[in-house]
Amino acid sequence: RVLLTVALCVAASASFAQKKVVNEAQSIAKGSNADFGEARTLIKGALENPETKDDAKTWYVAGFIEDQQFNAERAKQILGQQPNEPVMYEALYGILPYFQKAYELDQLPNEKGKVKPKYTKDIKSILSANHVYLFNGGAYYFDKQEYKKAYDFFNQYVEISELPMFAGTQTAEKDSTFMTVQFYAAAAASLAKDSRLAIAALERAKNTPYRQYDVYQYLCYEYGEARTAQDSVMLEKTFEEGMQVFPDSAFFLNNLINTYI
């Protein structure tokens, strides 16, 4: 019994120590003297530790650290100073994976069988506030011709819009900005020379009105480049769809005829 009591005390002490590490990481990431490297090191350990890796707060703090660094760099921009743009955008991009896991854990029932989310409100608020900056990040890497990174940012914008947590909110609206981002995600994937990625992005974008003619043309090109038997079938199908959607264009009919010559 004594040994059991000692073991329980040690376990409780270890659990408390790890939760203290999570709080410390969050504290270090706050304020003008934030040390994001140290905060990340601490939270990385907590994300791997059995005592804290299944706590919503651990994952929330990991995303919070990324958000704090993003905001620290963006504050420089607001003040007319030059931010470290790669650092700023990489921190921005890093928020979502942590918050998705935190959100998932935050919806689980507590020890009394009740669901009482603690971090969901903040998660939704931060993701919504930062949403448009993913467009900026995609444009930044697109201009630098880092097309795969550009795709990642544009695609994360679309991904957030489609998260169930934002259903019925402004963040989920398929407005002109959404359609523009969706198009540039496809364009970036194509320019990155990744046909599979480009095809998926173009298929997603083809049913929205933004630059729909261009999307169909790019889709035909990508199916032609992919060159598998299934891609050849899809190429013909896309030519046929293009003829129906754009009956005044000779492009799709002429190219369909060429496939049979």
Predicted regions, residues:
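Structural register within alpha-helical repeat arrays
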Residues: E24, E38, A62, Q69, ...
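Short coil/linker segments at helix-helix boundaries
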Residues: I65-Q182, R196, A229-S232
